[in-house]
Amino acid sequence: TTGNKSELAVGYCTLYGDMNGGLAVIGDLYKTSVFALCDWLDSDAARGCRQALGLPTHGELVGEAIRRKPPSAELRPNQKDSDSLPDYDALDALLKALIQERQSGPTLVAAGHDPALVERVERLLKRAEFKRRQAAPLLKVSPQAFGSGWRLPIAAA
């Protein structure tokens, strides 16, 4: 599947659509990490890794046009993720705090995060559990991946 951890966390994915597949290769990478990985793959620093994997060592693998294109679910013309979701830098910072660091909403608000945004992200995270339960298995690369080690009530309020 094409989903990443940010999308799986907040349910920004379609059951039997982009969630359909046998393996969620980037399912444990936040969207900002996917962006960084794509930038790195196109950098000179990745040349040795690309060579070891038998990939082209010259030119771009991902490409500037793809890396700079605004993220979109592409379900309607001119749709962008930012129409429905917070900026991924802000979203991923909150998701990391809530998921990996197990911080509470009040703790995040006390640390200076926007209360409305914290409440919204917490609500999205809870309400998306039913989708995560139906997601393809993912490649675990973080200490706290979705799957058997992460469970919320499936019918969140």
What residue ranges belong to the model's regions?
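ATP/NTP-dependent adenylation/nucleotidyl-transfer catalytic domains that generate, transfer
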Residues: 1-157
